[in-house]
Design a protein with these regions (language model features):
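An N-cap/entry alpha-helix motif that binds or orients negatively charged groups
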Residues: 2-84, 190-252
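Alpha/beta enzyme core
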Residues: 98, 112, 133, 137, ...
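Generic secondary-structure signature for well-ordered alpha-helical cores
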Residues: 32, 48, 58-65, 119, ...
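Glycine-rich active-site/cofactor-binding loop and its immediate structural neighborhood
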Residues: 87-126
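Hydrophobic faces of well-ordered beta-strands that scaffold small-molecule active sites
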Residues: 91-94, 119-123, 142-146, 170, ...
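Domain-wide signal for the mature, well-folded portions of proteins, strongly enriched
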Residues: 23-27, 93, 267-268, 286
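A gly/proline- and charged-residue-enriched helix-loop-helix capping module
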Residues: 116-137, 141-155
Length: 310
């Protein structure tokens, strides 16, 4: 249990800093100061030379806004509908794995914030809080992201768990046929198994609030959705990540995705689309939506940015 005074101090610091964040770059700079460097680089970094990461951002500057004036803007309604669900903002939180690396409340905090904003929260298979734990705190619409695993029974188990706690839609991620070569992680030692450098350990001491909250929580860091697949006495995150890495199937084809659509029988999106041809294939197998994505540049460098694909 984290002492109350540490929690209050951490929240006060966060509130003070967030009030001074006015754009995404401010948030990025604040995160860099607030969490240890290995965790920040894991979150902020991308594959190889990070060409795709930079392209994802810079390509937005290639496009102009063409406003139309002398129209009634007395009442603005940004709400919309996506895969049959009404949301208050045309923004959806994408799935992010291992969120407790960045904040001890991880997916619990992010999903609650999404619900407060009236939009969708997408939970990753690699989450540090489980499907059920997130459902308990997230009153808003929920989607679950997964991959095509070698163990098809594991996929069906996820389907049943999601149905039981009313996840509305599934997201199939297809752009991770092999792990990405993220050089920042190699430098810091954020690998499987971890090989943290001396500089990385020193950085933990330079971020005492983050370190204290993590240590004093006494909560094991694990991939909660698959924790039951490891021996009871060996459920650390390294064991579970190694288990999941063995589950990734490089032989996956569109027929496997079609099988998942048929088994789920509900709203289904395919994430990682990077070509018109694959978007058409996704529609052909019965997907309700496609998500243009290059995984934030984390898997394949020199890929096209999603906005340029539009």
């Amino acid at each position: 249990m984290v002492p109350a005074f540490i929690t209050r101090l951490d929240e006060a610091v966060a509130h003070y800093c967030l009030k001074r964040c006015h754009n995404i770059r401010d948030l990025q700079r604040y995160a860099k100061r607030r969490i240890p460097r290995p965790m920040f680089d894991y979150m902020d970094g991308a594959a190889d030379d990070e060409v795709t990461l930079n392209r994802n951002q810079s390509d937005f500057n290639r496009y102009d806004l063409l406003p139309r004036y002398l129209v009634d803007v007395g009442e603005i309604d940004p709400s919309t509908e996506i895969m049959g669900q009404h949301i208050e903002l045309p923004i959806v939180l994408a799935p992010t794995g291992m969120s407790r690396l960045f904040n001890n409340d991880g997916e619990i905090a992010a999903s609650a914030a999404a619900a407060d904003a009236g939009t969708v929260y997408s939970l990753s298979t690699l989450s540090t809080y489980s499907i059920e734990e997130v459902a308990e705190v997230c009153s808003g619409p929920k989607w679950f992201q997964l991959y095509v695993f070698r163990d098809r029974d594991l996929i069906l188990e996820f389907f049943e768990r999601c149905r039981a706690v009313k996840y509305h839609a599934l997201i199939l991620t297809i752009d991770v046929p092999v792990p990405g070569n993220r050089e920042r992680d190699l430098y810091s030692g954020m690998t499987i198994p971890p090989q943290l450098s001396l500089a990385s350990y020193l950085d933990f001491f330079l971020h005492p609030l983050w370190s204290l909250k993590y240590v004093l929580s006494r909560q094991p860091f694990q991939l909660s959705n698959v924790a039951h697949k490891a021996p009871v006495d060996d459920r650390d995150v390294t064991t579970l990540v190694e288990y999941l890495q063995k589950q990734f199937d490089p032989t996956v084809k569109w027929d496997d995705a079609a099988w998942m659509v048929e088994q789920w029988q509900g709203p289904f999106a395919v994430k990682g689309i990077a070509s018109v041809e694959d978007a058409v294939r996704a529609a052909d197998i019965g997907a309700n939506a496609v998500i243009l994505s290059n995984h934030g540049g984390r898997q394949l460098d020199s890929a096209a940015s999603p906005i340029s694909l539009l």
